[in-house]
């Protein structure tokens, strides 16, 4: 099937051929800019006209044409690199007839180079007066116009390269994402953690409760999982004597897509030997407060019209939060039958593998989670839903585990790590029973991890934190796919 081509594209192809006729490569050669547009703006924007008259400041820049105006023997254009743009003035008498002809024929979206000097117009706009106009790349497709192009969010996600060109908001989101990644990495480096890399392809499913992607390793002739967590390999490194480790990377969960879930997502996981749950809580709070302070210059900001305050992190047990909303006290020793009866009364769906702990979690999800707007540590998760966490010393039905909730969503999951290999094996066996009852998110038996624990793992605290949701929060973005450069979309590989 022959692809359709618009009238504008036909004209642009003709212009490409015209460039070839005069021995100009439509797709350009190397240029060495003296400055980025950002450097020019930051360095010279505040200078007055007199400064440019007293000393000629020569520059060479490259960028994409995003605006063009003027007729006759002179005109203006705006060049954009990524996060900054600058005006250029192109005049026939200065650049010469041949170069001016190329300027007249150029289109929005073309990439060009300008050599010239800086001045300020009568309206005090910083401008480059062109002495040379250099064609670099012909854009064969037109950019969407300001009012009618790329209005559909799904189109923006499919064609992120166009979205980045035309939408400043998108550019700012991904610049901020890069800063967030850098700040997080610097924080853990400065705390003395060692950054490591662990395999994406895993022979055993474990480290979290999730449905996996499965692939086949031809050379080894066996199936592998795309990792759903980095937890177990990182804890093996704790056994090996790496007492402070972290990894920033991609995880994969073969589950649904919605505003806060994407099957491929980024996390940081960090593990600290000789630490407990409170230590990890303090570490998480310090990391996030420093991050918010660096992004906003203060600890308060707005997300989706809600004022969020990071100066204080609340702390509440899971069962206490449920009691506050429902009056039900799950610290009472309810039987499974009593819990099932309560679930039925409160119209909570129950799966065949559900235990008391699963029902407690379901109550929390229905009555509490969405109401946790300000930063809140929720601790004391039931044992049955926490197969890798250590039991609480005072009530072994619960664990020394916490999750961080903000704006009604989970942002971090952490616990005092279970380091007893005998107890861990029992937990894995229970997970296998849950899988037989239909729990698709249950873990496998990881014999190598058990073997590692038998060599002795020191008391350890661990943290997993989602980076994409953090970027959403700190850029006031409502959908997770708008903070991922190339999210998965339907019909993504069509030529459009």
From Swiss-Prot:
Subcellular localization(s) per the UniProt record: Cytoplasm
Binding-site positions, Mg(2+) 1: 403, 410
Cofactor binding note of this UniProt entry: Binds 3 Mg(2+) ions per subunit.
Catalyzed reactions per annotation: tRNA(Lys) + L-lysine + ATP = L-lysyl-tRNA(Lys) + AMP + diphosphate
Keywords from the UniProt entry: Aminoacyl-tRNA synthetase, ATP-binding, Cytoplasm, Ligase, Magnesium, Metal-binding, Nucleotide-binding, Protein biosynthesis
Residues annotated to bind Mg(2+) 2: 410
Enzyme superclass (EC): ligase
Keyword Metal-binding assigned: yes
GO MF annotation list: ATP binding; lysine-tRNA ligase activity; magnesium ion binding; tRNA binding
Lineage: superkingdom: Bacteria
Major subcellular site: cytoplasm
E.C. code: 6.1.1.6
Name of protein: Lysine--tRNA ligase
Source organism of this protein record: Aster yellows witches'-broom phytoplasma (strain AYWB)
């Amino acid at each position: 099937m022959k692809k359709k081509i618009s009238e504008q594209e036909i004209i642009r192809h003709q212009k490409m051929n015209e460039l070839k006729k005069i021995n100009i490569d439509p797709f350009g050669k190397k240029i060495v800019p003296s400055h980025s547009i950002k450097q020019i703006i930051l360095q010279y924007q505040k200078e007055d006209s007199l400064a440019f008259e007293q000393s000629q400041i020569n520059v060479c820049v490259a960028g994409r044409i995003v605006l063009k105006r003027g007729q006759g023997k002179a005109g203006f254009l705006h060049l954009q690199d990524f996060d900054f743009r600058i005006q250029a003035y192109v005049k026939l008498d200065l650049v010469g007839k041949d170069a001016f002809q190329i300027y007249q024929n150029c289109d929005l979206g073309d990439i060009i180079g300008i050599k010239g000097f800086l001045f300020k117009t009568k309206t005090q706009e910083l401008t480059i007066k062109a002495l040379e106009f250099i064609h670099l790349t012909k854009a064969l497709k037109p950019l969407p116009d300001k009012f009618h192009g790329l209005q559909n969010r799904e189109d923006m996600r499919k064609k992120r390269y166009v979205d980045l060109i035309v939408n400043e908001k998108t550019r700012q989101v991904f610049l901020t994402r890069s800063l967030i990644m850098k700040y997080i990495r610097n924080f853990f480096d400065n705390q003395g953690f060692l950054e490591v890399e662990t395999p994406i392809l895993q022979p055993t499913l474990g480290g979290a409760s999730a449905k996996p992607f499965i692939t086949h390793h031809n050379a080894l002739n066996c199936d592998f999982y795309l990792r759903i967590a980095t937890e177990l390999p990182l804890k093996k490194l704790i056994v090996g004597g790496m007492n402070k480790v972290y990894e920033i990377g991609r995880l994969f969960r073969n589950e649904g897509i919605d505003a806060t879930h994407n099957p491929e997502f980024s996390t940081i996981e960090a593990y600290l030997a000789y630490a407990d749950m409170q230590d990890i809580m303090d570490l998480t709070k310090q990391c996030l407060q420093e991050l918010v302070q660096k992004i906003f210059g203060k600890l308060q900001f707005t997300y989706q019209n809600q004022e969020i305050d990071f100066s204080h992190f609340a702390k509440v047990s899971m069962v206490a939060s449920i009691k506050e909303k429902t009056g039900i006290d799950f610290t009472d020793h309810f039987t499974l039958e009593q819990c099932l009866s309560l679930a039925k009364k409160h119209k909570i769906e129950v799966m065949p593998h559900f235990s008391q702990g699963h029902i407690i979690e379901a109550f929390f999800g229905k009555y509490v989670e969405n109401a946790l707007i300000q930063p809140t540590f929720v601790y004391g998760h039931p044992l049955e839903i926490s197969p890798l966490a250590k039991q609480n010393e005072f009530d072994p039905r619960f664990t020394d585990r916490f999750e961080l909730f903000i704006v009604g969503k989970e942002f971090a999951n952490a616990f005092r790590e279970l380091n007893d290999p005998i107890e861990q094996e029992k937990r894995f066996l229970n997970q296998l029973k849950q899988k037989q009852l239909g729990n698709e998110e249950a873990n496998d038996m990881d014999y190598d991890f058990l073997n590692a624990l038998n060599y002795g793992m020191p008391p350890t605290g661990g943290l997993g934190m989602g980076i994409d949701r953090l970027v959403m929060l700190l850029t006031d973005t409502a959908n997770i796919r708008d903070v991922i450069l190339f999210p998965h979309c339907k019909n993504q590989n069509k030529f459009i």
